[in-house]
Amino acid sequence: MNAQDVLKVHYEQFYGALLSGDLNALSALYSDNYRLVRSDGSMLNKEQVLRDLREGGLAFTSIMLCIEDVRVFETTAMVIGESHATAIRGGFTTSTQFRLVAVYEEIDSALRLAYFQSTQLPHDVSVAS
């Protein structure tokens, strides 16, 4: 596993599945012990995240990783960065800018997303560092 492998999975599999609404692909990507920590501090497990996407009507229309820093530690990798996302929920469009940490683990020669945490940034904070 190297940084390029991790970013490919992050962009193509994770962001790709979110943008296309492919819950089966997300389910396959998320590890069984996956945890999402939202900007408000709430924490969801794999099934809760998939249920929220399915029943909550959340649809992403764009996701852009603006700054990325990948760290690889044997069979674990972290993506640290800043991102912009636009999504629709309940007929309302929201655009957010946030910092993120995504932790991937290598399981049976495949990268699986084990943890994702985001911290929303005020709209007037520059994404560039």
Regions found by a protein language model. Name each.
Residues M1-A25, R35-S129:
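A beta-strand edge to alpha-helix "cap/lid" segment located at domain peripheries
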